[in-house]
Amino acid sequence: MNKAISDLSAHTPMMQQYWKLKNQHLDQLMFYRMGDFYEIFYEDAKKAAKLLDITLTARGQSAGQSIPMCGIPYHAAEGYLAKLVKLGESVVICEQIGDPATSKGPVDRQVVRIITPGTISDEALLDERRDNLIAAVLGDERLFGLAVLDITSGNFSVLEIKGWENLLAELERINPVELLIPDDWPPGLPAEKRRGSRRRAPWDFERDSAHKSLCQQFATQDLKGFGCENLTLAIGAAGCLLSYAKETQRTALPHLRSLRHERLDDTVILDAASRRNLELDTNLSGGRDNTLQSVMDRCQTAMGTRLLTRWLNRPLRDLTILQARQTSITCFLERYRFENLQPQLKEIGDIERILARIGLRNARPRDLARLRDALSALPELQQAMSDLDAPHLQQLAQTAGTYPELADLLQRAIIDNPPAVIRDGGVLKTGYDAELDDLQSLSENAGQFLIDLEAREKARTGLGNLKVGYNRVHGYFIELPSKQAEQAPADYIRRQTLKGAERFITPELKEFEDKALSAKSRALAREKMLYETLLEDLIGHLAPLQDTAAALAELDVLSNLAERALNLDLNCPRFVAEPCMRIEQGRHPVVEQVLSTPFVANDLALDDSTRMLVITGPNMGGKSTYMRQTALIVLLAHIGSFVPAASCELSLVDRIFTRIGSSDDLAGGRSTFMVEMSETANILHNATDKSLVLMDEVGRGTSTFDGLSLAWAAAECLAQLRAYTLFATHYFELTVLPESEPLVTNVHLNATEHNERIVFLHRVLPGPASQSYGLAVAQLAGVPGKVISRAKEHLQRLETTSLPHEQPRAKPGKPAVPQQSDMFASLPHPVLDELSKVKVDDMTPRQALDLLYTLQTRL
């Protein structure tokens, strides 16, 4: 990090100017505009050269030291900025605001923008499929206020959360690229371990000033209308976010129009482990392939894709909203109405982010061209929605509206294919502004004007040797030979005498000169002014346009879900008041798409008589798939989607927990078993009788008896909590749980052996599995034949020699648990092995006694 320079007297004037600006932004890289380059100096240069793989050099001296520096062309800055932002860096853009031709000393410069990962809005720097969120948090270990802002859409929300565990789960859900925390928090707190965490001064979170700035932003007297007047901590966090956004953008933020109060009680909560295990929008390898999002997303717009991602990561418990979405999807499916709408939606584009850039006053010409095309497409879109009779769809159609005046304005203003930036002009159409047309005509047609003027003057004066010309010193002129100079008309004003010639100027030529010499720069300046005026006109319509964008995004998602329902054979789930979860012919929506063979659908039935299924069966038999598909079906139902099942009847759930798969946490110093136990503890502490719990192979990673005991106790606890539980295990001993826990039922995934090879049937059947087929799976995996053979020998010996071990005691008042052989017990003791080989009939009494003494010493 750079250190502040207090004594600037020894530095050159240029470096004094640089350090005055840099001292205010020591922890950020500074791009310092000098001519056609952004120059980067000192420690910033060393860091940028390494990150961007550009040459580090040194040029000149200041304060007796050479200046490390590197630079990038200003017209290529976008690519470099994108790379830095992806690396989590923030960049201060310092531009020349003075005129080099008139400046005495260094040209005036000022910071015009600060680009940070959470406040970028440039299309080239953003992932169009993901929200780009920045969050701020305030509070203590008991209660936290969290504010979340997407500056690229204007979405601004607050909520209050109890405890670190819930806060971290919510941060995992929203996954902000920046997280602002108070500077007076002690170091090392869990939130600070997230990438992108930044400390801000405590007064940025001060409640009263935050309340005042938020009211000013939304032009309200208080925040009661947003339902968050009493959320002291959340308001403080929101004020910090607003301050940070203004600081980085250096402009007003008219697209931030409201504050939404979110409540965790309105949602189905998924913790970090559950999101990871269910692979909602990111697979276990960190990619996007073979995720629920990849299967369910055929949205026509990027803003629709982002909204669908939000829905998948925030399933709802509001039955009114869910049923409105179901009705909308049903309406779209009638007569395949979605097919009429989707091509129209494709013409809309990502107007949500375009409108945000307009609000930030950094929209580019191509943004306005896309907005023009979108507004022009709205009438046809409205026509396509005219026969939609679902109330929610009618409301969305009404909100979308049309904007013929704005469409006409942009149609008149912006050329068909504008350049990427306004910098060099050429954006506005001929005919949009008469003065601009005149200036551009002067600039582009100066040569023709001079030819025409020369012809007119020759005709007027009768002087055939008259010439019209130009030089840089004297400008435009009319030249006559000295012999004809006396015949010059009275309106000719002598400008220059040459050997053998005289040069004149006329009022008409002088007027043209004044216009022509500055026409190009004046045309560019006027075009930029007109462009900024156009942006201001659009900002005046920002509120209804943003409402339109939100309505179109939701229409896109709902029509997409209708298309998915048709093409993936999804059916509408039915929510009921009775506590239950009944699925007929359920399928895993992702696995089904990647299989080359038909997917084997399975049923599930949980209700007041059965709250837990103990699932046994071979590895690769489909236990994990069966559990995951249940969770995904329940989750899809809670976003209002149709589900991959012949039928589904369920009550609302409050949480979805998963304890599936194995992974360690090396950075946190936690083993695989420790991670597993932490996830199990979280489930046991937070599950309720409305939660869906998936537990897969609990107890692995420790000794057989420890693991079995933990799994047994965890299963008993969940059964007593009455959570909807799928409990997959290889501990066959757990199949006796139904005898002591009446809400528990056994099911198994079946398989068979054919020609000594295992065949997985993937069918869920009642009762426990008959065997585990572990050796057959190992053989299928390619374990060497000699190892398989030796394993069979050990298995046979274990099955014939292992003694029953003591089972966990039954609870008081419950029947005793039948004893079973432990197929996982350790190998027999060598003494027992030797005893089994003794031929007793061939020994004398003395030999037998001696052998007993010998064996006794080995015990």
UniProtKB/Swiss-Prot annotation:
- Which GO biological process annotations does it have? mismatch repair
Which is one Gene Ontology cellular component term of this protein?
Answer: cytosol
**Stretch list, region Disordered:** 799-821
**SUPFAM superfamilies, sorted:** DNA repair protein MutS, domain I, DNA repair protein MutS, domain II, DNA repair protein MutS, domain III, P-loop containing nucleoside triphosphate hydrolases
* UniProt GO molecular function: ATP binding; ATP-dependent DNA damage sensor activity; damaged DNA binding; mismatched DNA binding
The residues that the entry says bind ATP are: 617-624
**Organism domain of life:** Bacteria
Sorted alphabetically, which keywords does the UniProt record give?
ATP-binding, DNA damage, DNA repair, DNA-binding, Nucleotide-binding
What the entry lists under HAMAP family is as follows:
MutS (MF_00096)
The family database entries (PANTHER family) matched by this protein are listed as: DNA MISMATCH REPAIR PROTEIN MSH1, MITOCHONDRIAL (PTHR11361:SF34), DNA MISMATCH REPAIR PROTEIN MUTS FAMILY MEMBER (PTHR11361)
- What protein family does this chain belong to? Belongs to the DNA mismatch repair MutS family.
Q: What does this protein do?
A: This protein is involved in the repair of mismatches in DNA. It is possible that it carries out the mismatch recognition step. This protein has a weak ATPase activity.
The protein, known as = DNA mismatch repair protein MutS
The gene name reads mutS
